[in-house]
C-alpha cells in the first residue's frame, strides 16, 4: 500500500470519528444505484413533468426536519454544539474555535470611525486615507466655488490686494437681468457681441441653428439654420465686429454679416477627398487668417482670401482637439486641449514632415507638424484652453481641475530639468514687444511639471450638459484678468488670474446649468446658455 493511500484511509477514519462525536441522527438510507447499470431516463418531457420522481425512499419512514432554535426558546446565537457533545475531542474543539474566530459576535452600535471599521489594521491613518481618496476621487463632485462665502471670509483677513477686493465687490453684485429661449436645442457655444451700444448674444445649438438675441429688445430671438450639424465654436472677425464665423461638426466654417444677413462658405472640408471632417473650434487671430481644429487631431490654416476648398492641414495628434487658443500677443503660438490627456503649446512658425506624434504614435507622413513648444500631461482629457493678454493659459478637463499657467511655466520651468540649470530671465510682455523664446532641444520633451494655480472644480457634465469651458475676459477695463466657468450646482464661478474667486452667481430662476458661458470682452456682462436652449443674461 502506498504512502498516499495510507494517508487517505487515515483521513477517512478520522472523519468518521469526528462525525460519531457529533451524535447526529442519521437519515433513512437511500437505495444505492449503480450508475453503470442504472436505466436511462426517458426523454419524454411532458410525461416526465407529470410523474413524481422515484428516489427509492420509503414515504412512511420518519425524516429529519430542521427546527428553529428561536421557536424552541433557545439562544439562536449560541453554539449548537454543547461542551459534552464534543466528546472531549481536542481536535474538534480546535476546529470549532477556528471557525468562530475565537470571538463572540456582537451587534455594532453607536458612532464608528472609519479606522474602526477597517478589516485590516496594518495600515496607518495616512495610508488608508490615501487609499480611500484614490477610490472615490477625493470628492470629485465638489467645486471650490461651492464654498465661496467661507473663502471670502478667510481671504478678507489675508488678502491686501485692493483690485481683487474691488473686483469681487463689483462682480458679486451682478444680477440676473433677463433670460430668453434663444435656440431650439442644447446650446454648445455662446458669444457676446463686442459692441457696447447694443447688447447682443449669439448661440450655436446642437442641430446647427444660430440664435441671435437682442437683450434690450422685447422681440423674439432670431434663429438661423446655418449648418446641418452641431455648432461648437463662434468667433468675430479681426477687422469687423459685424462679421461672425461659425464652425460645425459638418466639416464647414461659414461667415455671417450681421448687418445684411448674408452668409457664405469660408471652409469646406467635405469637398476635398480624404479630408478631416468635423470642426471643433475656430479662431481669427490675424486679418485674412483663420485657424480651425478638427475632431481627429488636425489643425487647418486658412487664408480667407482664397477659395473655401483651399487650405493647409497641420497634424497635431490622432485624437479629438476639444479646443484651442491663439496667443493674442505672439500669434504664432497656439495652445490645444485634446482627448489624448494633454495640453500642448505649438510654435506655428516652424513645421516639419510629421513622422511620429510626441509620445511615440506613428502617423501619416503626408502632413506637416508644427514645433512643439511645451506639453502638460493631465490625468484625463483636456476640454479647453484659453489665452489672455497677460500671457496666462487657463485649461480645464475631466480631471476636475482648473489649471492656470503663467509665462514662467511654459517658457522657463520646462528648461529646468532638476540638474541645477538656471532658468532664463523673464521678459516683460507688452503689445509692442514680444517675448524672446528660448531654444529647446528636440531630444528632450519640453514637459510642464505643474501649473502656477490649480483650482478644484467639478467638470463631470454627463450626457445632457454641454462640456464646461473656462473663458477669459479678453480686454478687462478694470485691469483684473478674470475668467468665468459654469458650476454644476447651477451657478457661475468667476476667478482671477491669481486663482482668487471673485463671484459665485446664482438665482432661483436659473434652474439649469449655464454650461456655455461667455464674457463681454470689456464690460462685466456674462451670458450663459443651458441644455434646453435658454440663455441667461447677467449684468
From Swiss-Prot:
Domain of life: Eukaryota
The protein's role, per its UniProt record: DNA-binding protein that binds to both single- and double-stranded DNA. Binds preferentially to UV-damaged DNA. May be involved in DNA-metabolic processes.
Renumbered ranges of WD repeats: 182-223, 226-268, 316-356, 377-415, 462-505, 508-539
A Pfam family of this chain: WD40
Source organism of the structure: Yarrowia lipolytica (strain CLIB 122 / E 150)
Composition-biased stretches (Basic and acidic residues): 27-39
InterPro entries in the record: WD40/YVTN_repeat-like_dom_sf, WD40_repeat_CS, WD40_repeat_dom_sf, WD40_rpt, WD_repeat_DNA-damage-binding
GO molecular function, a single term: DNA binding
Region span, Disordered: 22-89
Record key words, sorted: DNA damage, DNA-binding, Repeat, WD repeat
Family affiliation: Belongs to the WD repeat DDB2/WDR76 family.
GO cellular component: chromatin; cytoplasm; nuclear periphery; nucleus
Any one GO BP annotation for this protein: regulation of DNA damage checkpoint
Record's protein name: DNA damage-binding protein CMR1
